[in-house]
Amino acid sequence: MKSKRAFTLIELLVVIAIIAILAGLLLPALSRAKAKAHASACLSNMRQIGFAHRFYTDEHDGEFVQLTKAVRPPPDAILPWGNTWWPDLLQNALGRNTQIHSCPSLKDPKSFGIGMNHPELGHYLETAWKVKESDIANPSTTVIFADSGLLKNPREKNPDKWVVDPKFKGPSVYFRTPNNEPWYTDSPHRIHNRHGLTANTAHVDGHVEAARTSSIGFQYPLGHPQAYWDRQ
């Protein structure tokens, strides 16, 4: 009766090499699939936020939600920061679901990472006037919510090259517009291409889409026909 032949060292090394090659081929594909799933989930969250804002606007005679109001936040506030911020102002439509306000691509859900257009559409504290839907010339092209973060290269002219500062650990719930200097440069919370070559965006009319940050027109001044961050 023949005895079973044991693997030689060379055969074992060949098997290990084959496994390593297969893993090298599969892992990038799995990583891309995971990133795509995160981007889709983020877009779904953005859609729910967009619908909630439409609901809020309808209930408030066409007025947009403010970035933050100078009123005490609710006991179960999503953002217990002293004032009441837009995620809590939209609680009637969304409920207290913190995951909706967070991009799944971020490791820490408390980073949120979905921001409101500020100050062009979302005002800070109380102002003499409110932004209303009737103020928006092109609701279908005007971005109100999007992937946001604090940049480490705010003086970069090409928005597609903006990179989030890895040292920043705080939440990001707004993105600044170019008419918000000096804070636009000094505290550069902005839209960025979090999902490969695109950022997820929600528009005033309620629709959502993935778009390059450069296509939103942050390289253009207020009033430019390709500045899709302003009201004009």
What name fits each language-model region?
Residues 3-34:
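N-terminal single-pass transmembrane signal-anchor helix
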Residues 37:
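Phosphate-proximal small/polar/acidic motifs at interfaces that engage nucleotide phosphates
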Residues 40-232:
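Short, well-structured segments within or immediately adjacent to enzyme catalytic domains
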Residues 2-3, 59:
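Short alpha-helix boundary/capping motifs
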